[in-house]
């Protein structure tokens, strides 16, 4: 939005030309989202406390979690507002990639909001019925997938980028729609499963978003794209602004979500952030890179799948509790230790993922 205003004002003062620089807008997008989150945080926490919108804690969970009962939840609204406002201020609004991410972010946020509302306000422990949750997630993901396929059909935008192989980029055709669906829905639910400890989900989200900001910058630059042997996508550059907004909003939220948390993001935050990361990965043609950089989310999800599968097939559990972060809690690890170690692993995976762009 401000880019267009600056382009009009530059004829009166050349200083406004700075708004055309992607790096400048990326930095101020991060700072804007961070400032909004820090300013709105105390006000939103007070508002949620006034409405008595507190976290529901399972009775069969770790005993250390019982003290979390009543902590304000649905704080993901703070993240979504910060990201959306900052993005709309600093991005070029005629970019279709940006709107794809925002549609998924807001749409999945609404699904998560309804789920949280039913759990916390209406005291329905099941929340939004699972089949309806997956139905609306699927509708949104497929809608965006069809739109993206129509826009980039038979171009580099629908190729599959395989790590370590610079010349292996098969054209997916209609399979692109199916892959997009699974990546968006899968990542959304993976982040949701990871969001079980104070700050556990938000920091890996920040790391992955920061990694994708670098990838988006390279993908939108023809020289760097050719150098790294990745598809050049002219619309990808503006995703840098979205990614840095996620980083800023995430850090701002972490200010209040760090152990011991003053607020939880709830499904409104985790489903939306996961969906946004999945959409960004698909738009950049880096689905495999998401698996590497988002390895913490992948392991958390696999731990649940293995736990459920093992119990149904053998009547035995593999872990003391799933997702796997609860397993380590029940082994006696203090919550902050689990959180920080998962953060360290997440940072390492993001760096490894970025390194694969060059190792081809």
Curated annotation (Swiss-Prot):
Keywords: Cell cycle, Cell division, Cell inner membrane, Cell membrane, Cell shape, Cell wall biogenesis/degradation, Magnesium, Membrane, Metal-binding, Peptidoglycan synthesis, Transferase, Transmembrane, Transmembrane helix. One of its GO terms (molecular function) is phospho-N-acetylmuramoyl-pentapeptide-transferase activity. It catalyses: UDP-N-acetyl-alpha-D-muramoyl-L-alanyl-gamma-D-glutamyl-meso-2,6-diaminopimeloyl-D-alanyl-D-alanine + di-trans,octa-cis-undecaprenyl phosphate = di-trans,octa-cis-undecaprenyl diphospho-N-acetyl-alpha-D-muramoyl-L-alanyl-D-glutamyl-meso-2,6-diaminopimeloyl-D-alanyl-D-alanine + UMP. It is found in: Cell inner membrane. InterPro entries: Glycosyl_transferase_4 (IPR000715), PNAcMuramoyl-5peptid_Trfase (IPR003524), PNAcMuramoyl-5peptid_Trfase_CS (IPR018480). The keyword Protein biosynthesis does not apply. It is a multi-pass membrane protein. Pathway: Cell wall biogenesis; peptidoglycan biosynthesis. GO terms for cellular component: plasma membrane. Belongs to the glycosyltransferase 4 family. MraY subfamily. PANTHER family: PHOSPHO-N-ACETYLMURAMOYL-PENTAPEPTIDE-TRANSFERASE, PHOSPHO-N-ACETYLMURAMOYL-PENTAPEPTIDE-TRANSFERASE HOMOLOG. This is Phospho-N-acetylmuramoyl-pentapeptide-transferase. It comes from Photorhabdus laumondii subsp. laumondii (strain DSM 15139 / CIP 105565 / TT01).
